[in-house]
């Protein structure tokens, strides 16, 4: 491939998904400074996520959680040789443009930060940098993929050290895929129509305020320049690909609540392509040992005897939270 071809290929769906595949089978760790980034790299992380605070501290601090300071992200980028990701608020196109210009390797449009748009996620096809997005179920995953996400992750419930919501989301997506595979193409199209409904909310809201009929025409733009029927057809195409593959067509990581090597191994046993670890590393009593143990657990997830040794002398994991006691459920953000 010549230089011109490389330039023309930049930002294509194939290139974006190719980057995501490079981190497949690995661990991506949240870090808040250069020292933590170096600990993650030395432990074997395939990438780091640059944040101002880890999710547990974001949850504790309250208020509005935004993109990390540029100086902080740059400090982390300068400290390591592995890819650096950073988070933006759901729907915040300007934050994403800034991170793209800064040169991060991937952007996470994340429910961990305070959403900026109550109606839509970013149209990720408008960017050259690849995106990862969270999903609780097949509908959310397919919508994010149609919008251009190169990687999907479970939302879980970030900052809790509780794996239960990540398990829930893995099972919901897997069962959705199983049911799609049993459907006729006409039934799959009906599912695509159902999955497209969240894009109608803004248009229907405005019509309701104006006293107009609660109806959207097939040729009426409802998400950027995309019409309802174009969105349905796009979702249908992705669902047919899922039906054929028996899995999502992009890399699918676990995230939200991973706090121990056993949690990481469980996610891999459930069919995940890799693991994000947020608060679980640097809220543990021995971050370097916990980081290395979680990386090794992902590498040896199907070897119980090895997992026994990995789980020894790693210190105390982060203190977990009961999901039912939470005042704010981050996983419910987004559509």
Curated annotation (Swiss-Prot):
SUPFAM superfamilies per UniProt: Ribulose-phoshate binding barrel
EC numbers: 4.3.3.6
Manganese is among the record's keywords: no
Associated pathway: Cofactor biosynthesis; pyridoxal 5'-phosphate biosynthesis
GO biological process, one term: pyridoxal phosphate biosynthetic process
Binding annotation for D-glyceraldehyde 3-phosphate: 171
InterPro entries listed in its UniProt record: Aldolase_TIM, PdxS/SNZ, PdxS/SNZ_N, RibuloseP-bd_barrel, Thiazole_synthase_ThiG
Record-linked CDD domains: pdxS (cd04727)
Molecular-function annotations in GO: amine-lyase activity; pyridoxal 5'-phosphate synthase (glutamine hydrolysing) activity
Pfam families referenced in this protein's UniProt entry, alphabetically: SOR_SNZ, ThiG
Residues noted as binding D-ribose 5-phosphate in the record, renumbered to the chain: 30, 159, 257, 278-279
Catalytic reaction(s) noted: aldehydo-D-ribose 5-phosphate + D-glyceraldehyde 3-phosphate + L-glutamine = pyridoxal 5'-phosphate + L-glutamate + phosphate + 3 H2O + H(+)
Highest taxon listed in the record's lineage: Archaea
EC class (word): lyase
The entry's keywords: Lyase, Pyridoxal phosphate, Schiff base
Active site: 87
Quaternary state and interactors: In the presence of PdxT, forms a dodecamer of heterodimers.
Record's function text: Catalyzes the formation of pyridoxal 5'-phosphate from ribose 5-phosphate (RBP), glyceraldehyde 3-phosphate (G3P) and ammonia. The ammonia is provided by the PdxT subunit. Can also use ribulose 5-phosphate and dihydroxyacetone phosphate as substrates, resulting from enzyme-catalyzed isomerization of RBP and G3P, respectively.
Family of this protein: Belongs to the PdxS/SNZ family.
Record-given protein name: Pyridoxal 5'-phosphate synthase subunit PdxS
Protein species of origin: Thermococcus kodakarensis (strain ATCC BAA-918 / JCM 12380 / KOD1)
High-level lineage: Archaea, Methanobacteriati, Methanobacteriota, Thermococci, Thermococcales
Gene designation per UniProt: pdxS
